[in-house]
């Protein structure tokens, strides 16, 4: 076992050395791709929205619980002046029972779409009812391919169309209200920048850690070269997807760069976003995420202990049918 672990470790170290050398070479070949950020003193109203999910499997249906929370941090002259929540600091979760026939490949999309239904819906309402300068989503601001159902029941397809419509409302409302719409992807596994630069197919964040200096951003690039070739972007509308841009920001030498997406007809807006995010993301050198996003994550999070009361009520209401509805794996006699 020790020999096997050593072999794996050596392979990883060798690969990492190669990745670092290639990353530095890419920087030398593309010096204009890395921009120094001039951080500004935080001032304004910055919002964040995140959602939490828990799912329970029964034989006859799937029960999904979702909570989404909006958080607004108001800064003045570099100091946090106030914190507000939408619709409240700890709203009750919403429950969704589904009894549609469901193939295994559509379990993930069903759960993700249900979360997005609440999360993006909350973001739209948050925009309409709160004065903001910028709104950040936890994650991408676009629907992902993994969220699109593969065939499946018509109810699932209707759910997908409802979510796509909410995304359209989100973009339209942000534009109407003059709010910058952006998303922070904490742990990006994509290779969009690698593809754009013709680099080896590494995950962007893995090689950018070596290529970027603290306080830098990458030059914003289009989210996709051909939005019409991606099913979910085509469903959303290529006119919207064509105005979504991507860059990475490195706020600390002890943490990886994180990905930022934003909606604008002018990619130069990315520099303004980075100027705000940089100082706010340097509170903790080992976890460079802006505090309003962290607060939204904490407020939206669902844990099974907090939902035990609701689940016990349901179990009691089902009575003798309870064991029938439980998945067989939960009834193992050993």
Give, region by region, the residue ranges found by the protein language model:
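Generic structural motif
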Residues: 49, 83-87, 260
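Two-metal-ion RNase H-like nuclease active-site motif
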Residues: 44-54
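Short loop/turn segments at secondary-structure transitions that flank enzyme active sites
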Residues: 52-55, 72-77, 141-143, 187-190
